[in-house]
Design a protein with these regions (language model features):
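Compact beta-sheet-dominated globular domain cores
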Residues: 167, 248-292
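Internal, charge-rich low-complexity segments
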Residues: 3-260
Length: 292
């Protein structure tokens, strides 16, 4: 009887251990398959709108603050080198660099503002994109795996994989390559080149120091909000994919999903109007929502 009781107790312990293990496995599976998110689309949209507002206000302030200094550069080589850097980077499109250097901005700095908006929007796009390779080239391989998973797995599976992968990838990537300060310094560099291309006087180092001193905090705040989007979209949302977008010139303008920020709103659109042509540059971030 004692032997039978001991055997029954052993079997019970084994069964309890097995049950605990299976329960833990089910909890893990439930976590992996759960698609409930704490972040609403409205919150994400509000964040993107805040980023766009910061881009506009920062570009407008910088372009206005330097209005008295456009065309005062004493050395044409400095202007030419800045135009070359902008042209090579494609950060403000193919046409704007030369236009900036050959236009008188002293009366109206609107072209400077547009160029600054374009540069800041493009840099914010790279900072906000979860799979951007502009700073972390390691993510390119992970993104290719994710793209393949999206073709064959459920949203709950590849969405959870994305959140976990990006969370742990961020943990091992050096802070100096991914923090707001690094992105802000990149923004300062391109603001500097735009101003130099417009003929602002001073050496590249002097103008850059001015930009950093007077607008560094603004640009870091912009970079911080872009990284907030990156973290939320990449690491917190499972049930859908949210991505910021920019349109690369010279793509054709499509009014069904693009907005012409400088259009004449007083002039009614005609259904027989000719195509609007190609875009010059993108000045704001767009937002795409995908759910499979």
């Amino acid at each position: 009887l004692e032997r039978a009781l001991a055997q029954a107790q052993t079997e019970r312990r084994d069964l309890t251990t097995l049950l605990d293990r299976r329960t833990a496995e089910l909890k893990e599976a439930q976590t992996y398959l759960n698609k409930v998110d704490d972040v609403a689309d409205s919150e994400v949209l509000a964040l993107v709108q805040r980023i766009n507002t910061q881009i506009f206000q920062t570009a407008a302030k910088i372009s206005d603050d330097f209005q008295a200094f456009y065309g005062t550069q004493k050395y044409s080589a400095i202007v030419k080198e800045a135009v070359g850097r902008l042209d090579k980077s494609t950060m403000v499109g193919a046409e704007l660099p030369l236009i900036l250097s050959t236009t008188d901005h002293s009366a109206d700095p609107i072209l400077v503002q547009i160029a600054l908006q374009c540069a800041l929007a493009t840099l914010a796009f790279h900072a906000a994109s979860p799979w951007s390779t502009s700073f972390e080239k390691q993510t390119a391989f992970l993104h290719s795996i994710y793209a393949e998973m999206c073709k064959h797995e459920l949203q709950s599976v590849f969405g959870r994989w994305r959140t976990m992968t990006l969370t742990y990838a961020r943990a091992i990537i050096p802070e100096k390559t991914q923090g707001a300060s690094a992105h802000a310094l990149k923004m300062i560099d391109y603001v500097n080149d735009v101003l130099l291309a417009c003929g602002v006087d001073g050496s590249p180092e002097q103008v850059r120091d001015l930009v950093k001193q007077h607008y560094g905090k603004r640009l870091k705040q912009l970079a911080t909000h872009a990284l907030d989007f990156r973290r939320i979209a990449g690491e917190q949302i499972v049930s859908r994919d949210l991505q910021v977008i920019v349109v690369w010139p010279p793509s054709p303008f499509d009014p069904t999903w693009m907005e012409d920020e400088w259009a004449d709103t007083k002039k009614p659109a005609s259904p027989t109007a000719s195509p609007a042509g190609n875009i010059l540059c993108t000045t704001n971030l767009g937002l795409i929502r995908q759910e499979r």
